[in-house]
C-alpha cells in the first residue's frame, strides 16, 4: 500500500491533538510507514481557527515520518477529493450538512468521525467505510484514551490505519458501537470529572493551610500514583482502598463523610447523564 493524503475536516481541539500526534509520531518501521500519511490537509471554515492551526504547525520541527502539512480554509471539497482518509472533527449538529457537501463518489475513502453521538448508521449514509473514535483532551499531550468502533465495511487494512493513527494520542481500545455513548461519558468527559476531584483536593489542602503550589503538586501526584498502583498491582480499586484504611483511622473517617455526601453515587450518576446526552446529540438535526 502506498502512502496517502489525510484530510482533517474541522481541525479544532481534538483535530489539532491528532494532527500534532500523527505529525510528530516517532520514526515508523518500513512496514508501519504505509499506515502514515505523506500529507495532512487541516481544514477549517473559520479563519480564526485556521490561524490557531497555523500557529500550532509553525512550532513543529521536521516530521520523523516525512509528513507535510497544508492548512486550508473553506476548501473541504478539494481537500477531501485529494484525500484517501478523512478525519471528521466537527460538532455533532453540523456533521451531516458538511458530509452532504463532501461526497464519496467511489466509496473507497475511509471516514474517521470524532463526533459524539453520531452513529455508524448515520455516517454510513454518506461513506461506506466508517470508523468512530472517541478520545479526550489528554490526547494533546500523548496521554489520551481512544475508543474505536468500525462499520462492517471497514477492511483489516483500514483498521490498521485507524489503530496506527489513533494510538499516537495514547491508549487505543476497540469496543462495539453499543458502548460508544458510555465511552463518550467515561473517556471523553472523564477528564473533567477527574479535574473536579483534583481541584477539590487542591482546595482542601489550601483550606487547611498548605500553600497552593504544594497542594497542587500533592493532589496531582496522589492521582497519578494511585492510578499507577491500580495498573501495576492488578487489584480492584475497592481492595486497594480498604488497604489504606485502618480501624478508627483518618481514611475511614473521611470516606464515611464522602459516602454521607453521596460522592460515589454522584460520580456514577454524572457519568450516566453524560452518556444520555451523548445519545441525544446524534439525534439532533
From Swiss-Prot:
Question: According to the UniProt record, what class of enzyme is this?
Answer: oxidoreductase
Pathway stated in the Swiss-Prot or TrEMBL entry = Amino-acid biosynthesis; L-proline biosynthesis; L-proline from L-glutamate 5-semialdehyde: step 1/1
UniProt keyword annotation of Magnesium present: no
Would the keyword Acetylation turn up in this protein's UniProt record? Answer: no
Q: What is its EC number?
A: 1.5.1.2
Keywords assigned by UniProt?
A: Amino-acid biosynthesis, NADP, Oxidoreductase, Proline biosynthesis
InterPro entries listed in its UniProt record: 6-PGluconate_DH-like_C_sf, NAD(P)-bd_dom_sf, P5C_Rdtase_cat_N, P5CR-like_CS, P5CR_dimer, Pyrroline-COOH_reductase
Give the GO biological process terms: L-proline biosynthetic process
Q: Which GO terms describe its molecular function?
A: pyrroline-5-carboxylate reductase activity
What domain of life does the native source organism fall in? Answer: Eukaryota
Known catalytic reactions: L-proline + NADP(+) = (S)-1-pyrroline-5-carboxylate + NADPH + 2 H(+); L-proline + NAD(+) = (S)-1-pyrroline-5-carboxylate + NADH + 2 H(+)
- Assembly information from the UniProt record: Homotetramer.
- Family per record: Belongs to the pyrroline-5-carboxylate reductase family.
Q: Which protein, by its recorded name, is this?
A: Pyrroline-5-carboxylate reductase
The encoding gene is: PRO3
Amino acid at each position: 500500500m502506498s502512502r496517502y493524503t489525510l484530510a482533517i475536516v474541522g481541525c479544532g481541539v481534538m483535530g489539532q491533538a491528532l494532527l500534532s500526534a500523527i505529525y510528530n509520531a516517532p520514526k515508523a518501521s518500513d512496514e508501519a510507514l504505509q499506515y502514515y500519511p505523506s500529507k495532512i490537509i487541516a481544514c477549517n471554515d473559520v479563519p480564526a481557527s485556521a490561524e490557531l492551526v497555523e500557529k500550532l504547525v509553525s512550532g513543529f520541527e521536521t516530521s520523523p515520518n516525512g509528513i507535510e502539512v497544508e492548512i486550508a480554509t473553506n476548501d473541504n471539497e478539494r481537500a477531501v477529493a485529494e484525500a484517501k482518509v478523512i478525519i471528521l472533527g466537527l460538532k455533532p449538529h453540523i456533521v451531516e450538512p458538511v458530509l452532504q457537501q463532501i461526497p464519496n463518489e467511489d466509496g473507497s475513502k475511509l471516514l474517521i468521525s470524532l463526533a459524539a453521538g453520531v452513529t455508524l448508521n448515520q455516517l454510513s449514509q454518506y461513506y461506506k467505510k466508517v470508523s468512530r473514535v472517541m478520545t479526550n483532551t489528554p490526547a494533546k499531550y500523548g496521554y489520551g484514551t481512544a475508543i474505536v468502533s468500525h462499520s462492517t465495511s471497514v477492511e483489516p487494512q483500514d483498521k490498521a490505519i485507524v489503530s496506527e493513527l489513533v494510538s499516537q494520542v495514547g491508549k487505543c481500545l476497540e469496543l462495539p458501537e453499543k458502548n460508544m455513548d458510555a465511552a463518550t461519558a467515561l473517556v471523553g468527559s472523564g477528564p473533567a470529572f477527574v479535574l473536579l476531584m483534583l481541584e477539590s483536593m487542591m482546595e482542601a489542602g489550601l483550606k487547611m493551610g498548605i500553600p497552593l503550589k504544594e497542594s497542587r503538586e500533592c493532589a496531582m501526584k496522589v492521582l497519578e500514583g494511585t492510578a499507577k498502583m491500580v495498573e501495576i498491582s492488578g487489584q480492584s480499586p475497592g481492595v486497594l482502598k480498604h488497604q489504606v484504611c485502618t480501624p478508627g483511622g483518618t481514611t475511614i473517617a473521611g470516606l464515611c463523610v464522602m459516602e454521607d455526601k453521596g460522592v460515589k453515587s454522584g460520580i456514577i450518576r454524572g457519568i450516566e447523564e453524560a452518556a444520555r446526552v451523548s445519545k441525544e446529540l446524534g439525534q439532533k438535526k
